Swiss-Prot record:
It comes from Chlamydia felis (strain Fe/C-56). HAMAP family: LpxB. It comes from the Bacteria. Residues 1-224 are annotated as: Unknown. GO terms for cellular component: membrane. GO terms for biological process: lipid A biosynthetic process. The keyword Lipid metabolism applies. This is Lipid-A-disaccharide synthase. Condensation of UDP-2,3-diacylglucosamine and 2,3-diacylglucosamine-1-phosphate to form lipid A disaccharide, a precursor of lipid A, a phosphorylated glycolipid that anchors the lipopolysaccharide to the outer membrane of the cell. Pathway: Bacterial outer membrane biogenesis; LPS lipid A biosynthesis. The keyword tRNA processing does not apply.
Amino acid sequence: MLPLHLVHVLYPIGLIANLFFGSAFTIQWFLSERRKKACVPKSFWILSSIGAVMMIAHGFIQSQFPIALLHGANLVIYFRNLNVSSSHSLSLRATLFILVVTLLLTTLPFVLGSYYYPNMQWMASPNIFHLPLPPPNIYWHIAGCIGLFTFSSRFFIQWCHLEINNRSTLPALFWLVSFIGGFLAFLYFIRTGDPVNIISYGCGLLPSLANLLIIYKKSRLPEFHNHSYFLSAGEPSGDILGSDLLHNIKTCDPTIRCFGVGGPLMRKEGFEPLIHMEEFQVSGFLEVFFSIFGLFKKYRRLYKAILQENPETVFCIDFPDFHFFLIKKLRKCGYKGKIIHYVCPSIWAWRPKRKKILEKYLDTLLLILPFEKDLFINSPLKTIYLGHPLVKTISNFQYCSSWKQQLSISDQPIVALFPGSRPGDIFRNLQVQIRAFLASSLAQSHQILVSSCNPKYDKNILDVLEKEGCRGKIISSTFRYQLMRDCDCALAKCGTIVLEAALNQTPTIVTCLLGPIDTFLAKYIFKILMPAYSLPNIITGSIIFPEFIGGKHDFNPEEVAAAIDILAKPKSKEKQKLACQQLLDTLMTNVVTPEECLRIICSQNSHLHLEKGILKNLHPRDSSV
């Protein structure tokens, strides 16, 4: 249709088009190798669309009708892949209409060209280097057409996959057809001496082979270890939840192997720790910053262990920031098992965008707070409200009246201090709590007992007591419920311990002294501004327990001491206890039973087969999985 010299001058358009195709497949291959699974970024379709437009022009210029026609059809499919996730997604009928119109518009110039130029070829052989090649016979042309149509049919396969699944992905059949069709076309263009298409189809064989290899390796992953669960709990509160979960799983099937990250309570249930929970005990920006290298090493060790062991289900218990990194890595590396997160991150308080991460990577989210269910009403993520496990744990707690004699504690009235579970928290909060006690009216009539969550932190507590010139005794956390029930009032660091105090109906004041950097981040960067910060106050929507939370300029020990004096009055104590009973009623409403929860989880996991008799024998101490 065009003069021969102009055809040769414009020949590089095809080369430039192949640069776009090559870039698209290079990006796709790189991301697939990185994520260990075949994936398709949006840039793949954009670059392919640009390349297709240029190849249509190349087909017109070089009088190669099959090239122009097939790239025209592919262009519509590229557009459909870009359009599928938009808010104005085209219907299948509209896409078919655009496809037919595109094919007609592509064919029309060749029909008109044949009318005005009877000698025009529809499949010319450029041979711009004038190689001494005889014209290919009819069989070569047939083989070439079969190769081209087979190669181009890959996107029709992908299109069908897209419309069925409503997801822009490249199935294994796409890559297989790409390789077979591309190989036939590659041989054909070698025979015709067409360098653009030799480069195009020759290079196209590489990503096809690479993706077929990735899919093959993924298919060769070992089957799930039928009696293997991975659990990870990085905090003491998570250790409590994890031990309850383990107890119910082991009651259901004692042969299941459970391994991962856990604390002393989980280890008592027969848990196999890869890393002890105590190694994760950091809080606040500075502590996390200086521990980042160690945390990264643990993260690498854990995800490699999971991929190697390939357990059927991964349970991540609280500790969301660390677990989010782990969950994302597992999915990117092709882990196909179920991922269940136990305890919803506080998206209702800050960083609400984490909800999208939960929906994208999780199979099930187990909730322990009653109001969290409302956050996922219109969400595709499966959620189960189990109720808080502390409710059943505390209701089944057997009080021992002789605990004071066992620990040689006098009958003097008690003020209980719960400074926290991490060294930094203990140092900051215990100072405030001791000073508040000494400034209160109870200093002369009461003794203070400090609850210690770990014996290795006892020296930290003794150092603070000595520094503040205060006599006090350290009580192991195993006696914390006896302590809560026998004390006149408690000062507790904001956290799970406050909810425990509320469920024990202990008159309590909440303290949480933050470091300067954490205070700045909370106030001005993350802007965590809420009417209340402790769980009892959040759940009930009222201030049951007075809160003193912030930096050193936000409150002082004298203010806390004034709150102690108010709380010491009988009417204040009774008011708190009544509110705590209302809190308990709220937590026990619409709770899913252990039987129901296990049945839901088992419906997702093939190896756990629950018999009615087994379910009836679940230990009564736990109302939450």
